[in-house]
C-alpha cells in the first residue's frame, strides 16, 4: 500500500494547521482518509473552446465525490490562438504552454494532491497540462471541452462556401472579390457554437492524441461540445480517476501512472494516429515536449520513421470539407486506430486509463468491427444541433446513419489511403540540418516538389503587409525568419500569411518557409519548425532575396541552392556584425516575460522546451 501524497497535510499532529485550513475550504473529518483529487480547469470567457467549462468542473467534482474522492478545483490560463493571431499577442501563445505546465505542477505539488483531472481544450492548454501530467507522474486523466460544430453552408456572390469555419473567414478577408457584406455572411457562419475550432486544427489534433496515448476516454477528441453525450465523458472521468487512485495507492498498481500509460509504444501509436489523420504540425512540437517531460525515449527521428511507414487515412478541414463532426460520425479516433491496428501499424501491448489492452479498447469502441457494441454506436451517432449557442450538452441530435465507408468516406482503410506516406513529413537538408515539418496532407501531390526564388521577410508582420500589398509574386518562396522560439520570441503561428496567400489566389503558386510554426488551420506549401532557427545561427538567417529554395517532399529535403563558399562568406559577415543573428529593422516590443522565455527556449526539433540547468 502506498501512502496518499496528501497524507502530509491530513494525517498526524504536525498537520493540524493544514487540516484547519482544509476545514476552512470545506473538508470534513471523513475526507481526511480519502484521495484529494485536483481538477485543473481552464474555463475562461476569452476562448470559445473554454467558455462553456465554468460548470463542467462541478460535474467532474460530483462524480469524484460520489466515487469516494475529494475534488479540489483550480484554474489555469488559456490563450485563444485565433484571437491572438496577427498581432503581438501571438508571441505569448507557445510560452503560455510552459506557464500552464508550471502552474499545474505548482498547484498539485504545493497542496500534495493525489491525482489530477485535466479539463483542457484549445491549442496550448492540452499540451501544457500533458507536460505537467508527464512531469508529475501521478494518476491523471484528460477530458476536453470538445469541438465546436462546423458553420453552415453559405453562398456569397454566387460562390458556395460549404461548410464554413474559422479559416474560411480569414481567407475571405484577404480575397478582394469578397465584399464587406459577403465577408460578414461568412464571418457570422464560421464559428457557430462553443468548442474548439471545428477542423483538424491543433486543439482537436491534441485532444485526439490524448486518446491514442491512453490518457483520455474514447470520444474525447471528436464528441461535440454541444452534444449531451459529452456530459458522460466528464462524469466517467471523475469516476475513473478515483478508481485509478484506489489501484495505485491501495493496490500498488503503478500501471495507471502517466509514464506507464503513455510509454514509448503509446507515443509511437499517438504519432501513428497523427500521421493517419493528417493532424496539425503543432502536434510534433507538443509530442516531443511531452516525451521530454516524461523521460520517454521519443524524438524527431521516431516521427520521421513513422511518417515513412504510415499512410494518410483521413483528410479533414482545412484540407477537405470534412470537419470533426464528420470524423465522429465515421467512428472517431477508435475507428482510425482500428484501421491502423488491422494493418499491423500499432503496438498492441499498450493500455489506457479505461482499458487493460488495446484489443479490449478497440473491441468496445471501434464501430467498424464485425460486431460493434451498442455503447459505441450510441456515442458515434451524436450529431450537431445546428443552433448558435455557447451552452454545452444542449443537443441530443442523432445521425440517421454512420459513415463506415472505408473506400471513400471520411475515414478510409489502408488499401484506400489518400497517400502511402503520412500526413506529416520531416524534411532535412542544408536549410534544416536538425529538421523541419511540412503537412503533406494539405498539399496536392503534384506540388510536392517546389523550387523558386526567395522573398525574405524578417517578421510575420512584414510578410502580411507584403502579401496584402501584392508584393509577393507567383513562384516565389516566402521566407519568414526570426520567428522561432528564441528569435520571435514565442514561435508565432503563421496562419494569417498562409490564409492571406490563399485568399490572394497564391495558395498553390507560392511556398512559405519559416522557423516559426503554423496553425492547425494553415494549408498550402508551408514548411515550419526549421531547425536550427535563425536566432541560433540557422542557415535560414543567411538567405538573400532571389536565392533558390527547393522543397522536395518525395526526397524529404529542404535546401538552399547557394554555393558553400558564398554561404561561408555570409556567415562570417553575420558573425562580426553589430547585432549577429538578429532581425534587421524589426519593430517589436519584447517584454521581460518574453525575454525570460527566449533566454531558455530551444529550437523546434526538441519541442521548443526550455533549457534549464539541473540544480537538483
UniProtKB/Swiss-Prot annotation:
EC number: 4.2.1.9
PROSITE patterns, sorted: ILVD_EDD_1, ILVD_EDD_2
Signal peptide: none
A Pfam cross-reference name: ILV_EDD_C
Cofactor details (free text): Binds 1 [2Fe-2S] cluster per subunit. This cluster acts as a Lewis acid cofactor.
Pathway note: Amino-acid biosynthesis; L-isoleucine biosynthesis; L-isoleucine from 2-oxobutanoate: step 3/4; Amino-acid biosynthesis; L-valine biosynthesis; L-valine from pyruvate: step 3/4
PANTHER family given in the database record: D-XYLONATE DEHYDRATASE, D-XYLONATE DEHYDRATASE YAGF-RELATED
The protein's name: Dihydroxy-acid dehydratase
Organism: Corynebacterium kroppenstedtii (strain DSM 44385 / JCM 11950 / CIP 105744 / CCUG 35717)
Chain's gene name: ilvD
Amino acid at each position: 500500500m502506498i501512502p496518499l501524497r496528501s497524507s502530509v497535510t491530513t494525517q498526524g499532529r504536525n498537520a493540524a494547521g493544514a487540516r484547519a485550513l482544509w476545514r476552512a475550504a470545506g473538508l470534513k473529518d471523513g475526507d481526511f482518509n480519502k484521495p484529494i483529487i485536483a481538477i485543473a480547469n481552464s474555463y475562461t470567457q476569452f476562448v470559445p473552446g473554454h467558455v462553456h467549462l465554468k460548470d463542467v468542473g462541478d460535474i467532474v467534482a460530483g462524480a469524484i465525490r460520489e466515487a469516494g474522492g475529494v475534488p479540489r478545483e483550480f484554474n489555469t490560463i488559456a490563450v485563444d490562438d485565433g484571437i491572438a493571431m496577427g498581432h503581438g499577442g501571438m508571441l505569448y501563445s507557445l510560452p503560455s504552454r510552459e506557464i500552464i505546465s508550471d502552474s499545474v505542477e505548482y498547484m498539485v505539488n504545493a497542496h500534495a494532491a493525489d491525482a489530477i483531472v485535466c479539463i483542457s481544450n484549445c491549442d496550448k492548454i492540452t499540451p501544457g497540462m500533458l507536460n505537467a501530467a508527464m512531469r508529475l507522474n501521478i494518476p491523471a486523466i484528460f477530458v476536453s471541452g470538445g469541438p465546436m460544430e462546423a458553420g453552415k453552408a453559405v453562398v456569397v456572390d454566387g460562390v458556395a462556401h460549404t461548410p464554413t469555419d474559422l479559416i474560411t473567414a480569414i481567407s475571405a478577408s484577404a480575397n478582394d472579390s469578397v465584399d464587406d457584406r459577403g465577408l460578414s455572411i461568412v464571418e457570422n457562419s464560421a464559428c457557430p457554437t462553443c468548442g474548439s475550432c471545428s477542423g483538424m486544427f491543433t486543439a482537436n489534433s491534441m485532444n485526439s492524441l490524448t486518446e491514442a496515448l491512453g490518457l483520455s476516454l474514447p470520444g474525447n477528441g471528436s464528441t461535440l461540445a454541444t452534444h449531451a453525450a459529452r456530459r458522460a465523458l466528464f462524469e466517467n472521468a471523475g469516476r475513473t480517476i478515483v478508481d485509478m487512485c484506489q489501484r495505485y495507492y491501495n493496490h500498488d498498481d503503478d500501471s495507471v501512472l502517466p509514464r506507464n500509460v503513455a510509454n514509448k509504444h503509446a507515443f509511437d501509436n499517438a504519432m501513428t494516429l497523427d500521421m493517419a489523420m493528417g493532424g496539425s504540425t503543432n502536434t510534433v512540437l507538443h509530442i516531443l515536449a511531452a516525451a521530454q517531460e516524461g523521460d520517454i525515449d521519443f524524438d524527431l527521428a521516431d516521427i520521421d520513421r513513422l511518417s515513412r511507414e504510415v499512410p494518410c487515412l483521413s483528410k479533414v478541414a482545412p484540407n477537405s470539407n470534412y470537419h470533426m463532426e464528420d470524423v465522429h460520425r465515421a467512428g472517431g479516433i477508435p475507428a482510425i486506430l482500428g484501421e491502423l491496428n488491422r494493418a499491423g501499424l500499432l503496438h498492441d501491448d499498450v493500455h489506457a486509463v479505461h482499458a487493460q489492452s488495446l484489443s479490449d479498447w478497440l473491441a468496445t469502441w471501434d464501430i467498424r468491427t464485425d460486431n460493434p457494441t451498442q455503447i459505441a454506436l450510441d456515442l458515434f451517432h451524436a450529431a450537431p444541433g445546428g443552433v448558435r449557442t455557447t451552452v454545452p450538452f444542449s443537443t441530443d441530435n442523432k445521425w440517421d446513419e454512420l459513415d463506415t465507408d472505408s473506400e471513400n468516406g471520411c475515414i478510409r482503410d489502408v488499401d484506400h489511403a489518400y497517400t502511402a506516406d503520412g500526413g506529416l513529413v520531416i524534411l532535412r537538408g542544408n536549410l534544416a540540418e536538425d529538421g523541419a515539418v511540412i503537412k503533406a496532407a494539405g498539399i496536392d501531390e503534384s506540388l510536392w516538389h517546389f523550387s523558386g526564388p526567395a522573398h525574405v521577410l524578417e517578421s510575420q508582420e512584414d510578410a502580411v503587409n507584403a502579401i496584402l500589398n501584392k508584393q509577393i509574386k507567383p513562384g516565389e518562396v516566402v521566407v519568414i525568419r526570426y520567428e522561432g522560439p528564441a528569435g520571435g520570441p514565442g514561435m508565432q503561428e503563421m496562419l494569417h500569411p498562409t490564409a492571406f496567400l490563399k485568399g490572394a489566389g497564391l495558395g498553390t503558386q507560392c511556398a512559405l518557409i519559416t522557423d516559426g510554426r503554423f496553425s492547425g488551420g494553415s494549408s498550402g506549401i508551408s514548411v515550419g519548425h526549421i531547425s536550427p532557427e535563425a536566432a541560433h545561427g540557422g542557415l535560414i538567417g543567411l538567405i538573400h532575396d532571389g536565392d533558390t529554395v527547393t522543397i522536395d517532399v518525395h526526397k524529404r529535403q529542404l535546401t538552399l541552392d547557394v554555393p558553400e563558399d558564398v554561404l561561408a562568406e555570409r556567415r562570417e559577415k553575420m558573425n562580426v556584425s553589430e547585432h549577429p543573428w538578429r532581425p534587421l529593422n524589426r519593430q517589436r516590443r519584447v517584454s521581460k516575460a518574453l525575454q525570460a522565455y527566449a533566454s531558455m527556449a530551444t529550437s523546434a526539433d526538441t519541442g521548443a522546451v526550455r533549457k534549464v540547468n539541473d540544480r537538483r
